C-alpha cells in the first residue's frame, strides 16, 4: 500500500539508480512500501527468498542513494537478497513478475543479467573476498570507484569470509563492508561469532563522540605527539564503549550498530564511510521478513518459500495426502536409528529443515550439530568424531558439499573413516538456477578411494534399504526409489515429494560397502 492514498506510484518510475537518487527523502518510505508489496505479490506466486529481501529494502535503497552503480561496485553475499537491487536497477515490471521463471529475473545475481550485478553468487561467504579483489584491482589501476561488500551475519560463520577479513588491511585502504545482521542464515545463526554480534554494545554515543573528537584533533597542526595522543584516546575510549573490537583488531573502522530500517541513519553512515581513508565495516541491524507477518513469525520457513498465501502464510501447494519429501523420509530414518544408537550423530551446515534433520534436532538435540555455513569444518568435524567410534552423518546439499571436497578426500576417505554423507538436491535445481544444480557429485565422488556412492534405484528394484549398523560399522545407507523411466540405470533423486514408499522397520545387510558412504538424493 502507498504511504498516502493520493500519492502516485513511485516504483514504476524507477528505471535505474539515478531515479532513486532523484526522489525526495520524504518519498523514500513510500518507495520502500511499494517494493515490499511487489516482493510479496511476486513471491507468493513464484516462490523465492522473500524473508531476506523484505529485511533489506531500506538498506538497498540507501545503497543506491549513496553509490552509483555500475561504476561503483556492490557485491552481495549469496545474492539471494538481490531482489530489491533488481527492482532499483531497471529489472522491474514484467521481467520481475517472471522472477525465477523462463524469460524473467533470476533468483540470484549474475553478471550476464545486468551490468549492475558486479559479481555473481549463490553460495555464502564469497562477497568479501571478491570485493577485496575488486578494490585491490581498482588501486592497481589508479581508479576511484567505491567497492561495497554486503554480507549477512551468517557469512561470518564461513571460513573464507574470515580469510578475507584477515587480508583486508594488507590489500587496500578503501573498502566498505556492510554487515547485515538479522541473526539468521537459513536457520538461526550459531557459534561464537553469532554470539559476539548479539553482544556488541557500540552505540551512536561512541560514533558521535569519535566523529566530534576526530574533528577537534584535526583542527590542530599535525605532528608526531598529536597523532600519538589521538591514537591513544581512540584506543582507550573504544575499549570503554565497546565490549569487544573484533573488526577493529583486523584493521577495519567499525560503525554501528545502525537501525537497518531507518533510511536517514543508513544514508548518513554510508556517506561517512564513503569518505573514510581506511576500510570500514557498518553493522546494520535488520528484521528478516519485515512487512509480512508470517515471514516474521517463521523466518526459517520464509527464507526460501514455495508459493504461498500472503494472508495466512500457508503453502498453496500443500495438498492433503501428499507423500513426504525425500529429505523428510531420510530425516525420520536417521532419527529412528539415532534413538537406537547414541553414537549416531547428525551434522548440517545451517540447514536442519532443508536437509531433514529438524526431527533429530528436536528429539535428540545432544546428537545433532548445526555448524553454520561451514561445510569444510562440518566434514572435518565428522572425521574427528569418526575416529572415536561415533557414526556421524553429514546432511549437506549436493551443490554445497563441493565446498568441502579436499576434506572428503584428505580427511575422510584417505583415512577410511566411517562417515556418511547425505547429499540432498541432486540433479537440476529448477528455479534456483545454475549455482544450485547438483550436477557434479557423481563425477567428483566416484573417483575417490574408500567411498561407496549410492543413488536412487529404478522402480522395479527394492524401494530403499538401510544397512546393518554392525556390518557397516554403524553407517546409515538410504536408497529411495524414483519413478520408472524405462531403464535399469540408476537415477538420482530430485527435490520434491517422494513416491510414498513405506519405510522398512528393520535394516538389511550390505557387508560389501566401504566405510565412507555417500547417499545422493
Regions found by a protein language model. Name each.
Residues 2, 182-330:
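Long, well-ordered, tryptophan-enriched scaffold segments
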Residues 93-108, 170-187, 205-208, 369, ...:
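A glycine-rich helix N-cap at a beta->alpha junction
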Residues 2-89, 246-270, 275-284:
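N-terminal amphipathic, basic-rich helices that act as targeting or association modules
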Residues 84-90, 156-165, 187-192, 197-198, ...:
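Short acidic, glycine/serine/threonine-rich loops at helix termini
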Residues 47-56, 75-80, 109-128, 151-155, ...:
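Active-site nucleophile and cofactor-binding loops and adjacent substrate-binding regions
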Residues 460-469, 473-474, 481-499, 506-516:
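Low-acidity, Ser/Thr- and Arg-rich intrinsically disordered low-complexity segments
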Residues 50-171, 326, 343-344, 357-358:
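Cofactor-binding active-site loop characterized by glycine-rich and histidine/acidic residues
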Residues 72-73, 286-402, 407-417:
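Non-catalytic terminal/interface segments that mediate subunit docking, oligomerization
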Amino acid at each position: 500500500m502507498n504511504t498516502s492514498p493520493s500519492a502516485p506510484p513511485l516504483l514504476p518510475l524507477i528505471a535505474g539508480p539515478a531515479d532513486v537518487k532523484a526522489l525526495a527523502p520524504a518519498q523514500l518510505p513510500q518507495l520502500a512500501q511499494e517494493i515490499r508489496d511487489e516482493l510479496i505479490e511476486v513471491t507468493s506466486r513464484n516462490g523465492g527468498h522473500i524473508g531476506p529481501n523484505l529485511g533489506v529494502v531500506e538498506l538497498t535503497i540507501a545503497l543506491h542513494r549513496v553509490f552509483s552503480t555500475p561504476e561503483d561496485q556492490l557485491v552481495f553475499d549469496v545474492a539471494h537478497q538481490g531482489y530489491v537491487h533488481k527492482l532499483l536497477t531497471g529489472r522491474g515490471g514484467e521481467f520481475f513478475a517472471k522472477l525465477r521463471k523462463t524469460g524473467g529475473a533470476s533468483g540470484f545475481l549474475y553478471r550476464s543479467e545486468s551490468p549492475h550485478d558486479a559479481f555473481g553468487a549463490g553460495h555464502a561467504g564469497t562477497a568479501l573476498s571478491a570485493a577485496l579483489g575488486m578494490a585491490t584491482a581498482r588501486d592497481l589501476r589508479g581508479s576511484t570507484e567505491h567497492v561495497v561488500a554486503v554480507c549477512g551475519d551468517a557469512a561470518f560463520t564461513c571460513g573464507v569470509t574470515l580469510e578475507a577479513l584477515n587480508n583486508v588491511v594488507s590489500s587496500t585502504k578503501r573498502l566498505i563492508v556492510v554487515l547485515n545482521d538479522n541473526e539468521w542464515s537459513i536457520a538461526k545463526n550459531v557459534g561464537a561469532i553469532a554470539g559476539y554480534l548479539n553482544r556488541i554494545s557500540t552505540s551512536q554515543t561512541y560514533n558521535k563522540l569519535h566523529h566530534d573528537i576526530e574533528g577537534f584533533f584535526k583542527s590542530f597542526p599535525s605532528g608526531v605527539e598529536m597523532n600519538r595522543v589521538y591514537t591513544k584516546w581512540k584506543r582507550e575510549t573504544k575499549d570503554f564503549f565497546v565490549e569487544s573490537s573484533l573488526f577493529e583488531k583486523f584493521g577495519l573502522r567499525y560503525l554501528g550498530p545502525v537501525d537497518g530500517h531507518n533510511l536517514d541513519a543508513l544514508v548518513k553512515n554510508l556517506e561517512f564511510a564513503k569518505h573514510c581513508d581506511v576500510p570500514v565495516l557498518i553493522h546494520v541491524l535488520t528484521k528478516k521478513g519485515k512487512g509480512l507477518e508470517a515471514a516474521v513469525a517463521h523466518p526459517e520457513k520464509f527464507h526460501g518459500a514455495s508459493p504461498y498465501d500472503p494472508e495466512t502464510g500457508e503453502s498453496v501447494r500443500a495438498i492433503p495426502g501428499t507423500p513426504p519429501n525425500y529429505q523428510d523420509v531420510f530425516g525420520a530414518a536417521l532419527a529412528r536409528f539415532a534413538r537406537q544408537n547414541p553414537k549416531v550423530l547428525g551434522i548440517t551446515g545451517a540447514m536442519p529443515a532443508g536437509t531433514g534433520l529438524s526431527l533429530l534436532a528436536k528429539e535428540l538435540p545432544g546428537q545433532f550439530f548445526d555448524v553454520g555455513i561451514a561445510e569444510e569444518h562440518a566434514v572435518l568435524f565428522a572425521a574427528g568424531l569418526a575416529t572415536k567410534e561415533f557414526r556421524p552423518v553429514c546432511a549437506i546439499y549436493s551443490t554445497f558439499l563441493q565446498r568441502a571436497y579436499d576434506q572428503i578426500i584428505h580427511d575422510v576417505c584417505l583415512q577410511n573413516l566411517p562417515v556418511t554423507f547425505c547429499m540432498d538436491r541432486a540433479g537440476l535445481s529448477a528455479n534456483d538456477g545454475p549455482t544450485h544444480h547438483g550436477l557434479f557429485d557423481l563425477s567428483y565422488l566416484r573417483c575417490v578411494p574408500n567411498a561407496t556412492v549410492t543413488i536412487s534405484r529404478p522402480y522395479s528394484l527394492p524401494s530403499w534399504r538401510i544397512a546393518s549398523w554392525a556390518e557397516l560399522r554403524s553407517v546409515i545407507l538410504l536408497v529411495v526409489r524414483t519413478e520408472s523411466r524405462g531403464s535399469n540405470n540408476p537415477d538420482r533423486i530430485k527435490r520434491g515429494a517422494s513416491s510414498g514408499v513405506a519405510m522398512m522397520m528393520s535394516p538389511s545387510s550390505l557387508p560389501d560397502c566401504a566405510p565412507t558412504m555417500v547417499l545422493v538424493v
